[in-house]
Amino acid sequence: MKWTILTALLIISAESKNLYKRDSEPHIRFLGEVYKKVDTIDFRGLVLITLAQHLQKCPFEELAKQVEQITTLAQACAAGARHADCATPLITLFLNRICAVPELSATYDWSTECCAKSDPERHQCFRAHRNPAPGTHYKRPEPEELCESYKKNKEDVLAHYIYEVSRGHPVLYSPAVLGFAYQFNGICSHCCEEEDKTTCFKDRMTQLKKALHIVEVQQKESCRILDNFGVRVLQALKLVKISKKNPKATFEVAQKLTSEVTHLNEDCCHGDMLECMIERMELTEHTCEHHEDISTKLKTCCEKPLIERTHCIVNLENDDIPEDLPKKVTKFVEDPEVCKLFADKKDIFLAEFLYEYGRRHPELSDQLLLRIAKGYEHQLEKCCELENFLECLKDGEHVLADAIKESTELTEKDCAIQQKLGDYLFQNVLLIRYTKKMPHVTTPSLIHITKHMTEVGDKCCALPNTQKMPCAEGGLSLIIGEFCEMEKTHPINEHVKNCCWKSYSNRRNCFTNLGPDDSYVAPEITDDTFHFTEDLCTLPEEELKNKKQGFIATLVKVKPHVTDELYGQIAVEFTKMREKCCAAEDHQACFNAEEPILIEHCKQLAA
């Protein structure tokens, strides 16, 4: 699709009064200005995040000293001090501080080259060298020790958490890190009062880690869309999300929010984390200033402190659809002027269609709504060439209904299969399906991908029907996005490449409809294809499941054209062999004797 509709959002911004003011030139930020926006504790946190994301190997104690010095300077700047650093652009100030760290080059050999440059080249150099450092994820102390420290000095415990998360996730947005620190604070406060602290921390921290992972993956996906499909596709996706979440907002408000959110993502994705941090706070402030024009659900979030507001707004549930909103917008299919509107202001007209359809259909996935807009544009191009264009457009409604029905039925079908089989067997079904599609992908990667797909199903199929499709296709899109990023450096086949890069909105559909790899030549089964060892008798349950799935994937790779039923028969034989040999006195001797028999059965499949 020609995503020219997205230019509309910028055109409209120029034609109407700004809801949010944005300078045409980049805004130069200063320390005192930022200090005034948040309270001192949050300011310290933001400074620590910025330093830890740039200096991932630097000890906490060293960064803590820098935080104190910068905070003291910020307080003076905010009070009107004439210190030279108060008039130094924020990113320049931070990089000056970083480059002044004693023996910096001993830890970061590339820092000498970076620090010799002038901004913005210096900043770009630092961004290029920012990578997650191994072993820098937060390691929680034992509950009793943690609670004792928390009781003595809560701020220090939270600062250590911020430090570890920041250096382990150097591209995670600063407000997001602070938001997770607030949640961690709540976990400590609650669990330290519980009798079974260990279980409490384990359960709550597992949930927090999952939430952090999801936010990070979502942020990376926005950046991947921006890099691979361009700003206009990202803008279309943001318009859909905003329209679904805020159905009471006018088109003007929705498109301006979209423009702001997209610009924020551009800054964040390009690595300008300070600007990203400030713009995120400003967007939150602006949203709350105009909350009555956006959503009735916002008021509660906007009563919270600035940093907490951001997390609240991002996770806010969809507003209720206005009761007086007509279910159908006749303008797009029955208005005699429809082709004139399309011809005169194509971009604006199509953007408005996306907005109107999105706000009426929160039960549809973002990607399906983008496909619908794509189909509508195609229908207009075809019908507006005809004399009876209105009849032609009405015929297009059947195509639209079929697309919605197909996606709905697919979600229902997969949920029914998963509910019937259970997670493990459902993953095995997916494993067979995707190994046939992509036999060149490594077995561990196939197991990893299908496990995450199963987790998406487990989460989304439990939701109400109105939420299943957005959850499922949204989750699968994130998995596919990560997979396609891997495909860039490890090409698989032309069909997969086409699914990854031809169309963002059609990615999931493309992978679902992808057939077996017709270019794949299966290797011969040899004595080295399968190996069964006595550790099959002692492995923990999860590792044993992985071993079984590794066997299934390898079997599909050597016999890609047999039926699922035959794969199932061999899997049953594998299980029987394991049970027999694990009951034998000499496990390995038994496996050595049974292995050739099972291999021979595998060779005979579809022979």
UniProtKB/Swiss-Prot annotation:
Q: Name one GO molecular function term.
A: serine-type endopeptidase inhibitor activity
One Gene Ontology cellular component: blood microparticle
Q: Which Pfam family, any one of them, does this sequence belong to?
A: Serum_albumin
Q: Which residues form the signal peptide?
A: 1-16
Propeptide per record: which residue ranges? 17-20
Ranges for domain Albumin come to 19-209, 210-401, 403-600
Identify the keywords attached in UniProt to this record, alphabetized. Answer: Calcium, Cleavage on pair of basic residues, Copper, Disulfide bond, Lipid-binding, Metal-binding, Protease inhibitor, Repeat, Secreted, Serine protease inhibitor, Signal, Zinc
| Residues bound to Zn(2+) | H270, D272
Q: Which residues are Ca(2+)-binding?
A: D272, E275
Query: InterPro entries recorded for this chain?
Result: ALB/AFP/VDB, Serum_albumin-like, Serum_albumin/AFP/Afamin, Serum_albumin_CS, Serum_albumin_N
PROSITE patterns, alphabetized = ALBUMIN_1, ALBUMIN_2
Q: List the disulfide bonds.
A: C77-C86, C99-C115, C114-C125, C147-C192, C191-C200, C223-C269, C268-C276, C288-C302, C301-C312, C339-C384, C383-C392, C415-C461, C460-C471, C484-C500, C499-C510, C537-C582, C581-C590
What tissues express this gene product?
A: Plasma. In the skin, widely distributed around the membranes of epithelial layer cells and within the stratum spongiosum of the dermis (at protein level).
Query: Which cellular compartments is it found in?
Result: Secreted
Residues annotated as binding Cu cation: H27
What does the function comment of this entry state?
A: Serum albumin, the main protein of plasma, has a good binding capacity for water, Ca(2+), Na(+), K(+), fatty acids, hormones, bilirubin and drugs. Its main function is the regulation of the colloidal osmotic pressure of blood. Potent inhibitor of trypsin but has no inhibitory effect on thrombin, chymotrypsin, elastase and subtilisin.
The record's family statement is: Belongs to the ALB/AFP/VDB family.
Could you identify this protein by its name? Serum albumin
Source organism of the structure: Bombina maxima
